[in-house]
From Swiss-Prot:
Pathway where this protein functions: Alkaloid biosynthesis
Enzyme class: oxidoreductase
Gene field: CYP82X1
Expression sites (tissue/organ): Highly expressed in capsules. Expressed is stems.
SUPFAM superfamilies noted in UniProt: Cytochrome P450
Gene3D superfamilies recorded: Cytochrome P450
Organism: Papaver somniferum (Opium poppy)
Name recorded for this polypeptide: (13S,14R)-13-O-acetyl-1-hydroxy-N-methylcanadine 8-hydroxylase CYP82X1
Domain of life, per lineage: Eukaryota
Primary localization: membrane
Binding site for heme: 483
A GO CC annotation given for this chain: membrane
Length: 540
């Protein structure tokens, strides 16, 4: 017989229902408290001291005396290879250890940290939603990245554009010779080599991307004025990159975007972003017109002078370009490749020359290697570079000490653990590449510039590359968002530096014969703070 509980004025309830309900409630409470207790027990990385109310460790980003990666490197010495800092109300896990990097990006885990933090500059100036540099990870990003890597920046593609790269390099070296010879004294000439590197790398990449020719006026690129569209793009890009270095309040406190609006920062970002898109739009339209006029020359449109824009237009014509606005996607790719490729490559060359000038015995050894393998009757060619093992070691050592991407900034796609420490979905991760590449447990005498460290005791070169396979050496980044233009940059660096060493005698212009190695205060990029002034003279 079913048992009932009878209460006055209440309909009788079967005891079985009460029992099931009671057990269910107890189970639900047990699960709730178990989950809550588990969350409480999740291990968190140690919190760095010194956080201020409301803003946390924000002062580290606003420090105009020390780069962020150095400040975080000093904190790693105190708190260990993983610790938390707070930026506003956002907690950031900072890792400075190659084993933890391997956990984040090794094997199948590289997808975990494949998103990036949005920024004010990306939103208003860099076409955030259509750029592979800032678009969220997903089908659109994967398709865009595939086009960049396979059709623009692959080894085969770069080989087809090699003649354009060489033409611009030849023009830049001719200009350097001209500057040296114009003083009429036969003595060394004072040259701002950081500026020369910047001009060379922009000219090379702009020639590949949209057909820009330095030292001349291409009718396709002139605006009817004395200045080509390529030159306008370069000047506007320099201003835009300067704006990116200005701290934006809303990058930390999104609700305070109105502050950046009042400061005029958003207005200026929009202005330069619109100008860059406008110039790129003209370049795209001119390429379209040239392709229509050259229909008889097949799909290339411009014959042997095909460039990146031509390839992207071909992809768009086949409806293979992702997104709803093909022109905006192409504009974004132009901006991403030109800005990302020229500035970082010139910075790598600048640091390499700084180190060589401060270590004349290394420079002397590099010259001897060049004289042995190349001789003195011709300049260095791309086919020579694999044989220049010591110069290749110089380049690796320079990138170890002064990596362009000194800090990687990523967001977790899902909840995970790094080094046993909990990272929530959407959690922010800083990878201190600069610190990892100076880790004394990996690198002997890590602060020394020593190209010889890249050779084994038997003289064979070490099997360590910068393609993300070796987690202790990641100057081009790591994971799915590592530098797409790594191969292009590597080719330029490995040809420009030996050609410069081979063709010119150089020494620091300072009274003490040393180059100032101070770094510019900033967040993620390792730039030289002061100009690189060098006394340059063509070798006899």
């Amino acid at each position: 017989m079913e048992l009932f509980i009878k209460l006055p004025f209440i309909q009788p309830i079967p005891f079985s229902i009460i029992l099931v309900t009671t057990v269910s409630i107890v189970l639900l409470y047990s699960v709730f408290f178990w989950v809550t207790d588990k969350k409480k027990k999740r291990k968190k990385a140690p919190n760095a001291a010194g956080a201020w109310p409301l803003i946390g460790h924000l002062r580290l980003l606003m420090n105009d005396k020390e780069p962020l990666y150095r400040a975080l490197g000093s904190m790693a010495d105190k708190y260990g290879p993983a610790f938390n800092i707070r930026l506003g109300n956002q907690e950031v896990l900072v890792v400075s250890n190659w084993e933890m990097v391997k956990q984040c990006f090794g094997n199948q885990n590289d997808k975990l940290f494949s998103n990036r933090q949005t920024t004010l500059a990306a939103k208003y100036m860099l076409n955030q939603t259509t750029s592979s540099g800032f678009a969220p990870y997903g089908p659109y990003w994967r398709e865009l990245r595939k086009i960049m890597v396979q059709q623009l920046l692959s080894k085969q593609s770069l080989e087809s554009w090699k003649h354009l790269k060489i033409k611009e390099m030849d023009a830049s070296f001719s200009k350097l010779n001209e500057l040296c010879n114009n003083n009429g004294t036969g003595t060394a000439t004072l040259i701002r080599m950081d500026e020369w590197f910047a001009e060379l790398t922009f000219n090379v990449i702009a020639r590949n991307v949209f057909g820009y020719q330095s030292g001349g006026r291409s009718t396709a690129l002139t605006n009817g004025d004395t200045e080509s569209k390529g030159e306008r793009y370069k000047k506007t890009l320099e201003e835009a990159l300067h704006l990116m270095s200005i701290f934006a309040v809303s990058d930390i406190f999104p609700s305070l975007e109105w502050v950046d609006r009042l400061r005029g920062l958003i207005r200026n970002m929009k202005r330069f972003g619109d100008e860059l898109n406008s110039i790129a739009g003209c370049l795209i339209e001119e390429h379209r017109q040239k392709r229509l006029q050259s229909v008889s020359k097949s799909d290339k449109g411009v014959g042997d002078e095909q460039d990146f824009v031509d390839v992207l237009l071909s992809v768009a014509e086949k409806s293979q370009l992702p997104g709803d606005d093909p022109d905006l996607v192409i504009k974004s790719m132009i901006l991403e490749i030109v800005s990302g490729g020229s500035e970082t490559t010139s910075s790598t060359l600048t640091w390499a020359l700084c180190l060589l000038l401060n270590h004349p015995h290394v420079l002397k050894k590099a010259k001897e290697e060049l004289d042995t393998h190349v001789g003195k009757d011709r300049h260095v060619e791309e086919s020579d570079t694999p044989k220049l093992v010591y110069i290749n070691a110089i380049i690796k050592e320079s990138m170890r000490l002064y990596p362009n991407g000194a800090m990687l900034d990523r967001l977790a796609l899902e909840e995970c653990e790094v080094g046993g420490f909990h990272v929530p979905a959407g959690g922010r991760l800083f990878v201190n590449v600069w610190k990892i590449q100076r880790d004394p447990s990996v690198w002997e005498n890590p602060l020394e510039f020593k190209p010889e460290r890249w050779f084994l005791s038997n003289g064979e070169k070490m099997d360590v590359d910068y393609k993300g396979h070796n987690h202790e050496f990641i100057p081009f980044g790591i994971g799915r968002r590592m530098c797409a233009g790594m191969l292009w940059a590597s080719e330029v660096i490995h040809l420009v530096l030996p050609r410069l060493i081979h063709g010119f005698d150089m020494k620091a212009a300072s009274a003490n014969g040393k180059v100032d190695m101070a770094e510019m205060a900033g967040m993620v990029i390792c730039f030289k703070k002061t100009p690189l002034e060098v006394m340059v003279n063509p070798r006899e």
